[in-house]
């Protein structure tokens, strides 16, 4: 089922980030220090009463005080476009100001569910200006304290009620493909080439935003849906705000896809924006194909192809399993080869490993390369089995997971990956203590 987006919006210093951290139950730093990945942390997967959703913290946006009102308005408009449910946060301890009222006015014009969260409420304060908040005109109104946890459960119950109300279960057996990349790498050209090449468009499904369209088509008797084909249109007046929110659009597409196509421009160096997008794919553990577009514009192709591959591998070490393909979306060169790779990946995802064969591979791996001592002891794996999941997932029962060094985990991943043909997809190893 598609994950819905819940956006927390409001002016600075009303407690958006505190509410974000309270809901996801842990503190997130602004910079996420993963190997090769550094990015603004304005989103997280969240869960309440077994329902999962994507939570967005707009507090990650820095605002130039001279452009304060303009930036607030832009922030609000983008949140409306992206979100399925909006939590509008105001400050109980301070009177409403013009920016609160401006946000409220914009939200009333939208068709999105809005929940008013009146933060910094401690139950002891005299409620002498509650009428101010009621005058904002929102029927869903909750007094909360993100610091002390007051009212958070009731707030999330309301969020989930809107998410559940909007759920529609449609039987769809097509493979969902997200085409992701920074502006002007040729995403739209690739979509057009895929669709026009096959000339078998099944449907165009309007998305939740004005400019998002999912396109379905068939190729070699397989059904495909390219999801979230429209990106946020880059407008100079939006500047960095749009760049940050483009990650939200990308995250939504990645989360709800089966396979991701990460597009880069063959004529330009790889940028932080490229690797940031790669980081989203890594976080979501999605199969990915790196599509190098505009290869027709490159001179000395035979000489340059190895250099480009080396550059890509160096920048995207954390998704080393990704296949790389060089194409020209405009000329339709090798475009259908992408779908052949997608079909191969789908086949790999369906492989089920027999338990006894898996344990033979792991026993052999431990013989040829015993686990190093770590945290005062040595890891010992007793047995393992594959469990049901979209990507190949294996539970390894051991003496204690704390004895696992990350380098040895990578070694075991590689042993499983190449023993069972998982070389082009992510796999997941879960270590559990044997009771």
UniProtKB/Swiss-Prot annotation:
GTP 2 binds at residues 181-188, 228-232, 293-296. One of its GO terms (biological process) is ribosome biogenesis. GO terms for molecular function: ATP hydrolysis activity; GTP binding; ribosome binding. The keyword Repeat applies. SUPFAM superfamilies: P-loop containing nucleoside triphosphate hydrolases. Residues 4-167, 175-350 form the EngA-type G domain. This is GTPase Der. It comes from Mycoplasma mycoides subsp. mycoides SC (strain CCUG 32753 / NCTC 10114 / PG1).
